[in-house]
Amino acid sequence: MTVKTEAAKGTLTYSRMRGMVAILIAFMKQRRMGLNDFIQKIANNSYACKHPEVQSILKISQPQEPELMNANPSPPPSPSQQINLGPSSNPHAKPSDFHFLKVIGKGSFGKVLLARHKAEEVFYAVKVLQKKAILKKKEEKHIMSERNVLLKNVKHPFLVGLHFSFQTADKLYFVLDYINGGELFYHLQRERCFLEPRARFYAAEIASALGYLHSLNIVYRDLKPENILLDSQGHIVLTDFGLCKENIEHNSTTSTFCGTPEYLAPEVLHKQPYDRTVDWWCLGAVLYEMLYGLPPFYSRNTAEMYDNILNKPLQLKPNITNSARHLLEGLLQKDRMKRLGAKDDFMEIKSHVFFSLINWDDLINKKITPPFNPNVSGPNDLRHFDPEFTEEPVPNSIGKSPDSILVTASVKEAAETFLGFSYAPPTDSFL
């Protein structure tokens, strides 16, 4: 017996129909194991995927926008384009491995949650991002860049470490070091400004982290108090690498307009090519804020603030030392070619007289006692997180794979876009 269908759909024989029925019966038996595994089996059967009945049952549909419609059927997907809705090949990396306890941060594409690994009894900060939101804003390159940068940061004491990353059909998960001493921004808000020794200590650890990134040809581009955390002992931890630019060598430049308004360097505002020295401008802006309570050139009117950054001379009040004044003048030099760090990068910062009291070997080995201790009692101590976050309920969807998700064209696009996102550490690392 042969059933004739449209020519474009091919010929459906009795044996092939039996094969499809067997797949559907298997689906019913495996329902409790989750839809994702079944979908993966279907997706690997290119003939079954093209059949209209299978498409109808699984809701695998083409985009409905008129400009995307194509009368000709698409060719079978290549192996690299197959729908991959499994969370990860790493057995440690799936949502159900965690107890998600509290929301501790929010961003443009998702939330950061305090989570405890069920088997390891270890606390992590898990950054959960919505694929749909990332694709809508066309930020997928920045997300993958953030993952790549995180993989390189594992061994630096002042950069947040990535333990593993994985994905479900609709979400990306970064499993990161849990840092609960609070954002530098939070502490600045409470105390308004810091005494110079404390500001020096933080600036030195920040500079060390930036210098390490530069040694990897990475420009950070978004240094600000919100991205600087304190760990439980009071050391700096730099986080959020979404705006990092890779492959920027010493004499290389880039031109993407990005950053946070208060901390943008003049060359970025001018939309001119810029280099690593944008990070030293930002360090100057953060140091200024630590000493004075507001960023340099600040105005509530953004246009006026931009004009100040471009044209207004730097004004320094007399309540800082000459070495601090000299450092700020060097870092906040409007001409990037004359800026401190333009010639020898981190070595210029490191050798500045303002840091003469810093033993850099002791600093990198955390042998210098921080000037402030957050005094957290343990992982569950959330006193340094904004209650706006911690009082928000944890979404139920965070901790499980979405068994009932429909495999639409957008899900297919997301699966293809983020192929290779999942990461598991070597067996002798972390887990």
From Swiss-Prot:
Residue ranges of the region described as Necessary for localization to the mitochondria: 1-60
Active site: 222 (proton acceptor)
UniProt domain Protein kinase: residue ranges: 98-355
Positions bound to ATP: 104-112, 127
Positions of post-translational Phosphothreonine modification: 256, 369
Sequence motif Nuclear localization signal, location on chain: 131-141
Functional note: Serine/threonine-protein kinase which is involved in the regulation of a wide variety of ion channels, membrane transporters, cellular enzymes, transcription factors, neuronal excitability, cell growth, proliferation, survival, migration and apoptosis. Plays an important role in cellular stress response.
Protein name: Serine/threonine-protein kinase Sgk1
